[in-house]
Amino acid sequence: MDPIILAEINGNIATVGYGLAAIGPGIGVGIVAGKTVEAMARQPEMAGSLRTTMFLGIAFSEALALIGLATYFIFTN
């Protein structure tokens, strides 16, 4: 095949791969935030501690998306 076509296919595959890699953290952040709100509704006095733990969970989940973004840039070049 033509090298230009192969480069285009490789770039498109990397784009789809990053999109798939971003789905997991998006779902994870939604679950973490939802469960934190449920826990705060049950025990309002623990809201500060729960909020801190929620932000840590979101940060770890978003780290996976950043790894996917780095992988995208590695495979497109």
UniProtKB/Swiss-Prot annotation:
One of its GO terms (molecular function) is proton-transporting ATP synthase activity, rotational mechanism. Belongs to the ATPase C chain family. It comes from the Bacteria. NCBIfam families: ATP_synt_c, PRK07874.1. SUPFAM superfamilies: F1F0 ATP synthase subunit C. The chain crosses the membrane at residues 13-33, 55-75. It is a multi-pass membrane protein. CDD domains: ATP-synt_Fo_c. InterPro entries: ATP_synth_csu_bac/chlpt, ATP_synth_F0_csu, ATP_synth_F0_csu_DDCD_BS, ATP_synth_F0_csu_sf, ATPase_proteolipid_c-like_dom, F/V-ATP_Csub_sf. Keywords: ATP synthesis, Cell membrane, CF(0), Hydrogen ion transport, Ion transport, Lipid-binding, Membrane, Transmembrane, Transmembrane helix, Transport. Gene3D superfamilies: F1F0 ATP synthase subunit C. It comes from Clavibacter michiganensis subsp. michiganensis (strain NCPPB 382). This is ATP synthase subunit c. F-type ATPases have 2 components, F(1) - the catalytic core - and F(0) - the membrane proton channel. F(1) has five subunits: alpha(3), beta(3), gamma(1), delta(1), epsilon(1). F(0) has three main subunits: a(1), b(2) and c(10-14). The alpha and beta chains form an alternating ring which encloses part of the gamma chain. F(1) is attached to F(0) by a central stalk formed by the gamma and epsilon chains, while a peripheral stalk is formed by the delta and b chains. F(1)F(0) ATP synthase produces ATP from ADP in the presence of a proton or sodium gradient. F-type ATPases consist of two structural domains, F(1) containing the extramembraneous catalytic core and F(0) containing the membrane proton channel, linked together by a central stalk and a peripheral stalk. During catalysis, ATP synthesis in the catalytic domain of F(1) is coupled via a rotary mechanism of the central stalk subunits to proton translocation. It is found in: Cell membrane. The keyword Cell membrane applies.
